[in-house]
């Protein structure tokens, strides 16, 4: 039984990488796949805290595993790796003892990994066959649409979940939903509440058949949204709030500020008090 280590970050859904995985699975259905996602910062934009970077990488792992299970019937092991892709890959080699490595990068003109001679270094250090797959997701796109969902108290409301379910069933591309839950403060209790809100959302969303993963984020919802827009290639944004009489986000004009910060369409979903109380 062969074991293949797949190393990728932003290109994890790229067409050429998916084909490389599919080819190996068709040649040998017993092949095991391990996905390693180094937790790398975006090159431009705001400074992003390490915890957010780690969570973003974990979201990529979670969504890759779920998408490949649903679309390709593959059960894949995944992990977040060291920020340095060479170290992350060598750590995964020691942990999983693969027979082959597939590394997916952006084209040479935009790939920081290639500027560091990653492919040659891995081949020399590991002694394993290393296939380099180039995925130009900026021109090719992805086989799914990524929807960024920003919510907190309304994250598991009926209104939001119905909106996402309708979007997922629109008959077009598969939708992957990334929910971001901003903290309500900087204390430990706020972290626990945000994680509880995330857990409740994930339970309900997955029960509804949605392909989704999520993370907690900066207490400022605008910064949380901007950070997520830097980390992920987002096709749509959904912002869920309470009504205008109760929503601090609306008083801060959050929806319009996000619209000005991205070219992606931004939708606003309002949950009623009763929905929120029952969620």
Question: Where in the sequence are the language-model features?
Answer:
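Short, surface-exposed alpha-helical segments at coil->helix boundaries
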Residues: 54-65, 116-119, 191-199, 252-255
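Short glycine-enriched, charge-decorated loop/helix-capping segments at active-site entrances
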Residues: 48-54
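Long, contiguous binding/interaction regions
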Residues: 125-128, 261-264
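Structural beta-alpha unit
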Residues: 72-100, 209-236, 276
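Short secondary-structure boundary segments
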Residues: 37, 105-106, 180, 236, ...
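Small/aliphatic-rich secondary-structure junction motif
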Residues: 1-48, 132-135, 142-192, 264, ...
């Amino acid at each position: 039984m062969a074991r293949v280590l797949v190393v990728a970050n932003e290109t994890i859904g790229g067409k050429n990488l998916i084909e490389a995985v599919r080819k190996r699975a068709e040649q040998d259905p017993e092949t095991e796949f391990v996905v390693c996602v180094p937790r790398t910062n975006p090159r431009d934009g705001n400074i992003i805290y390490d915890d957010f970077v780690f969570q973003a990488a974990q979201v990529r792992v979670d969504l890759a595993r779920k998408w490949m299970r649903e679309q390709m019937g593959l059960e894949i092991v995944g992990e977040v790796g060291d920020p340095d892709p060479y170290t992350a890959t060598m750590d995964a080699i020691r942990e999983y003892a693969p027979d082959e490595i597939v590394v997916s990068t952006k084209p040479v003109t935009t790939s920081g990994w290639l500027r560091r001679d990653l492919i040659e270094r891995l081949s020399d250090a590991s002694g394993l066959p290393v296939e380099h797959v180039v995925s130009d997701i900026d021109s090719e796109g992805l086989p799914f649409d990524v929807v960024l969902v920003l919510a907190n108290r309304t994250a598991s409301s009926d209104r939001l979940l119905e909106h996402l379910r309708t979007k997922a069933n629109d008959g077009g591309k598969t939708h992957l939903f990334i929910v971001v839950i901003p903290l309500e403060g900087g204390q430990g209790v706020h972290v626990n509440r945000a994680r509880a809100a995330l857990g409740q959302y994930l339970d309900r969303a997955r029960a509804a058949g949605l392909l989704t993963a999520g993370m907690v984020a900066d207490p400022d919802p605008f910064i949380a949204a901007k950070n997520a827009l830097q980390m992920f290639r987002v096709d749509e944004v959904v912002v869920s709030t309470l009504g205008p009489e109760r929503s601090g986000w609306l008083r801060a004009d959050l929806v319009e500020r996000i619209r000005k910060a991205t070219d992606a369409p931004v939708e606003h979903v309002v949950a009623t008090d009763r929905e929120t109380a029952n969620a």
